[in-house]
Curated annotation (Swiss-Prot):
GO molecular function: argininosuccinate lyase activity
Family, per entry: Belongs to the lyase 1 family. Argininosuccinate lyase subfamily.
Keyword Repressor attached: no
Gene3D superfamilies on file: Fumarase/aspartase (C-terminal domain), Fumarase/aspartase (Central domain), Fumarase/aspartase (N-terminal domain)
Protein's organism: Salmonella paratyphi B (strain ATCC BAA-1250 / SPB7)
Enzyme Commission designation: 4.3.2.1
Keywords: Amino-acid biosynthesis, Arginine biosynthesis, Cytoplasm, Lyase
Entry protein name: Argininosuccinate lyase
PROSITE patterns: FUMARATE_LYASES
One Pfam family, short name: Lyase_1
Matching InterPro entries: Arg_succ_lyase_C, Argininosuccinate_lyase, Fumarase/histidase_N, Fumarate_lyase_CS, Fumarate_lyase_fam, Fumarate_lyase_N, L-Aspartase-like
Pathway the protein acts in: Amino-acid biosynthesis; L-arginine biosynthesis; L-arginine from L-ornithine and carbamoyl phosphate: step 3/3
Length: 458
């Protein structure tokens, strides 16, 4: 049943109907549409449109429909209804007859869908926050177990300075904490109810919109009806949150793909998150991580697409805004799936400490320590930098690490170098010296783990 047929003398072309209908994706708003309708029925009692008995009948029928939807949401897709609003209204009329036709009094699909989508977004944000914190917790637990796993840190994908696997884990905890904060900020801004704003100019019934917002669990009602039915900032914000969050997960995946490679060999991924080759029997491919990395692009695309859709729209509602849902649903589903999969990857990961240690001892990752040693001896840093560069060239020529060069060879580059240089060049010394807040020293890493555990209530 179309909700707008009286104005028309011809039926819609079937091709247009298929093009126009949105039930195939907005069926996901069924529960929110029913919950919003229950609240609206209560508001109609306050302005005399419904009696208390009529409202009770409507609410009982809507609650029965809600249970039916929860038991079998796929039933909705068997309908020929235009959208989820017309499906719910049609089912309600089937249950209570003509009384069901009174429910839409004073309400437009414009404020109705805006309300439904905000309710869905609120619920989904809570799911994302839970999954985000679960992944943070998994990273903290992995860090706790690998505080002594020394490995090379990289810049330009070249070995730079020694770090620990724990410090690497904690870097992603920080990224995820920012993702969490962004979601919480987004939730604050979307937590206002547009219901009661009508098509664009407000409802003609003196409904207490603040009370109505409270019934639906919103903190308040929106302030301007024209903005309320046009607003999709929360869609853009959530897509932006997802895009940034997926960039973090993609970088996480890329790091672990490299760490798992034969060239690095720092970690071994569980059989539960890898697959084999149909031709090469020796292969163990990091498919879970590659899919996380690959899915990042579709989320970025959803954000870009929605921004382009909205940029040229005049106020208030336009049918273009129907395009807000498919990209949003897919992007947030994808982000949620990837958060869960990243946690599963960590659940079975094995860090190969000896290989990590060997790699950290190669590539002259202690060169900065020698420069700092010279600075402590009174050599200006820029000069010390040049001296160490020459020493590295000599070490490469001899095929030795810096700490294996004889003192006499080191003193060719600076007479201030003494026997006390060798303890400074050890990996442990490199770590211990990074003791400022946020550094890689064992004390700082342990403190960061404690702080994260306290914040996450682990």
């Amino acid at each position: 049943m179309a909700l707008w047929g009286g104005r028309f003398t011809q039926a819609a072309d079937q091709r247009f109907k298929q093009f126009n209908d949105s039930l195939r994706f907005d069926y996901r708003l069924a529960e929110q549409d029913i919950v919003g309708s229950v609240a609206w029925s209560k508001a109609l009692v306050t302005v005399g449109v419904l009696t208390a008995d009529e409202q009770r009948q409507l609410e009982e029928a809507l609650n029965v429909l809600l249970e039916e939807v929860r038991a079998n949401p796929q039933q909705i897709l068997q309908s020929d209804a235009e959208d989820i609003h017309s499906w719910v209204e049609g089912k309600l009329i089937d249950k209570v007859g003509q009384l069901g036709k009174k429910l839409h009094t004073g309400r437009s699909r414009n404020d109705q869908v805006a309300t439904d989508l905000k309710l869905w977004c609120k619920e989904t944000v809570r799911e994302l926050l839970t999954a985000n914190r679960q992944l943070q917790s998994a990273l903290v637990e992995t860090a706790q177990a690998n505080q002594d796993a020394v490995m090379p840190g990289y810049t330009h994908l070249q070995r730079a300075q020694p770090v620990t696997f724990a410090h690497w884990c904690l870097a992603y905890v920080e990224m995820l904490a920012r993702d969490e904060s962004r979601l919480q900020d987004t939730l604050k801004r979307l937590d206002v109810s547009p219901l009661g704003c009508g098509a664009l100019a407000g409802t003609a019934y003196e409904i207490d919109r603040e009370q109505l917002a409270g019934w639906l669990g919103f903190t308040s009602a929106t302030r301007n009806s024209l903005d309320s039915v046009s607003d999709r900032d929360h869609v853009l914000e959530l897509l932006s949150d997802a895009a940034i969050g997926m960039v973090h997960l993609s970088r996480f995946a890329e790091d672990l793909i490299f760490f798992n490679s034969g060239e690095a060999g720092f970690v071994e991924l569980s059989d539960r998150v890898t697959s084999g080759s149909s031709l090469m029997p020796q292969k163990k491919n990091p498919d879970a991580l590659e899919l996380i990395r690959g899915k990042c692009g579709r989320v970025q695309g959803a954000l870009t697409g929605m921004m382009m859709t909205l940029k040229g729209l005049p106020l208030a509602y336009n049918k273009d805004m129907q395009e807000d849902k498919e990209g949003l649903f897919d992007a947030l589903d994808t982000w949620l799936d990837c958060l869960h999969m990243a946690a599963l990857v960590l659940d079975g990961i094995q860090v190969k400490r000896p290989r990590c240690q060997d790699a950290a001892q190669q590539g002259y990752a202690n060169a900065t320590e020698l420069a700092d040693y010279l600075v402590a001896k009174g050599v200006p840093f820029r000069e010390a930098h040049h001296i160490v560069g020459e020493a590295v060239v000599e070490a490469i020529r001899q095929g030795k690490p810096l700490e294996a060069l004889p003192l006499a060879d080191l003193q060719k580059f600076s007479r201030v170098i003494g026997d006390d240089v060798y303890p400074i060049l050890s990996l442990q010394s490199c770590l211990d010296k990074r003791a400022a807040k946020g550094g890689v020293s064992p004390q700082q890493v342990a403190q960061a783990i404690d702080d994260a555990r306290a914040r996450l209530a682990l």
